Amino acid sequence: MRRRKAPVREVLPDPIYGNKVITKFINSLMYDGKKSVATEIMYGALKAIEKKGGDVKGIDVFNDAIENVKPILEVKSRRVGGATYQVPVEVRPVRQQALAIRWLITYARKRSERTMIDKLANELLDAANSKGASFKKKEDTYKMAEANKAFAHYRW
């Protein structure tokens, strides 16, 4: 384990919406340091959402998607006397956001649409409407925690 807790670096809000969560999303979306490509994909997806939705704002859909995918509970492995138990634990807010972003990007990449902009736009729309693969991942995580509620007293 490390001696000191690593300092949390502040991210700058993005230039268009002034939103730190969008900056974190772009940073997670980025491959090989190509931030301009990731930025184009993100803003392109938000514009595509506005085209599809009509009167809805892309940023509102994005915020709804993040909120809907944030997990409340997850399971952590804990060894007790030779047996490994899946112990349900509450998820800290910072980790909730990080997992939501990670799941949205992962499942957007697995979609079958033609471009990444379309994939991301459709995954965000699905997540905002409480469907899609990333929302299912959150539900599965919660079900796993509920199923192992009996081991909750092993929390640390």
Curated annotation (Swiss-Prot):
Keyword tRNA-binding among UniProt keywords: yes
Domain of life per record: Bacteria
GO biological process: translation
CDD domains registered for this protein in UniProt: uS7_Bacteria
Keywords for the protein's UniProt record, in alphabetical order: Ribonucleoprotein, Ribosomal protein, RNA-binding, rRNA-binding, tRNA-binding
UniProt GO cellular component terms: small ribosomal subunit
A Pfam short name: Ribosomal_S7
Keyword Ribonucleoprotein in record: yes
Record's function text: One of the primary rRNA binding proteins, it binds directly to 16S rRNA where it nucleates assembly of the head domain of the 30S subunit. Is located at the subunit interface close to the decoding center, probably blocks exit of the E-site tRNA.
Subunit structure: Part of the 30S ribosomal subunit. Contacts proteins S9 and S11.
Family statement: Belongs to the universal ribosomal protein uS7 family.
Protein name in UniProt: Small ribosomal subunit protein uS7
Gene that produces this protein: rpsG
